[in-house]
Amino acid sequence: MKIAVYGKGGIGKSTTSCNISIALARRGKKVLQIGCDPKHDSTFTLTGFLIPTIIDTLQSKDYHYEDVWPEDVIYKGYGGVDCVEAGGPPAGAGCGGYVVGETVKSLKELNAFYEYDIILFDVLGDVVCGGFAAPLNYADYCIIITDNGFDALFAANRIAASVREKAHTHPLRLAGLVGNRTSKRDLIDKYVEACPMPVLEVLPLIEDIRVSRVKGKTLFEMAESQPTLNYVCEFYLNIADQILSQPEGVVPKEIPDRELFSLLSDFYLNPINSGKNENIENNLHDFMII
């Protein structure tokens, strides 16, 4: 099974991906996580350091694939999760989709691409071009990470559009949304009411999730010395169990931008009609679509 994780930049995709990978490994699966970001920090909380990228390794070998060995590009992370960083082209040049393609090609050359029960692609930011959507070409499921905010759900809607487009030519389905570090889910519920899709889990607003990224540890590793965090790990295990049940998933029908803008902004501007919103003044922004 191959999973592509998307979401707005900075929403916590890598932290969530690493913990989902551990949860899948805890369920007895052989897992490979592939970071698809030039920052090559997707697997940082699994390995504790920035591992070399496949592109860097290929460049050092003059792209002689026969000179590349599995141990050159695949690193063992916490909990037995194998880790690969695709890397990316220089800033302002090249295509991220090409890098993903080269990564998959390299893993196939090493006979490693089909050795795993689960391959999880952790993909940078929003889908702004076909290159960034490249991991969807290989995925069975897409998971979108969001929060209870306007911008993240706007990005989620664009990703849903990419899933729908790719589903025309690939056996791809949207497994659902994961709400990350949010104390409420009312806006998420408002969105999925208009654009039906599963909500796999909503993770609580706790500082330890953010701190884990800085420490270079997953919540599972932190829970070994802080048993009070075990309850947070259960959220990720629940996501893993839903994925392993091979859900039917959906081919989403995204909401047109202007309709989504009206839907979400109305939620902020008319809290009486949209339900209670205690922090309306903190969440209100100036929105404008030209």
UniProtKB/Swiss-Prot annotation:
Mg(2+) binds at S14. PROSITE patterns: NIFH_FRXC_1 (PS00746), NIFH_FRXC_2 (PS00692), NIFH_FRXC_3 (PS51026). Pathway: Porphyrin-containing compound metabolism; chlorophyll biosynthesis (light-independent). SUPFAM superfamilies: P-loop containing nucleoside triphosphate hydrolases. Keywords: 4Fe-4S, ATP-binding, Chlorophyll biosynthesis, Chloroplast, Iron, Iron-sulfur, Magnesium, Metal-binding, Nucleotide-binding, Oxidoreductase, Photosynthesis, Plastid. It catalyses: chlorophyllide a + oxidized 2[4Fe-4S]-[ferredoxin] + 2 ADP + 2 phosphate = protochlorophyllide a + reduced 2[4Fe-4S]-[ferredoxin] + 2 ATP + 2 H2O. Its cofactor is [4Fe-4S] cluster. The keyword Cytoplasm does not apply. [4Fe-4S] cluster binds at C95, C129. It comes from the Eukaryota. Binds 1 [4Fe-4S] cluster per dimer. InterPro entries: NifH/chlL_CS, NifH/frxC, P-loop_NTPase, Protochlorophyllide_ATP-bd. Pfam families: Fer4_NifH (PF00142). GO terms for cellular component: chloroplast. Its main location: plastid. GO terms for biological process: light-independent chlorophyll biosynthetic process; photosynthesis, dark reaction. GO terms for molecular function: 4 iron, 4 sulfur cluster binding; ATP binding; metal ion binding; oxidoreductase activity, acting on iron-sulfur proteins as donors; oxidoreductase activity, acting on the CH-CH group of donors, iron-sulfur protein as acceptor. Homodimer. Protochlorophyllide reductase is composed of three subunits; ChlL, ChlN and ChlB. Component of the dark-operative protochlorophyllide reductase (DPOR) that uses Mg-ATP and reduced ferredoxin to reduce ring D of protochlorophyllide (Pchlide) to form chlorophyllide a (Chlide). This reaction is light-independent. The L component serves as a unique electron donor to the NB-component of the complex, and binds Mg-ATP. Belongs to the NifH/BchL/ChlL family. This is Light-independent protochlorophyllide reductase iron-sulfur ATP-binding protein. It comes from Angiopteris evecta (Mule's foot fern). The gene is chlL.
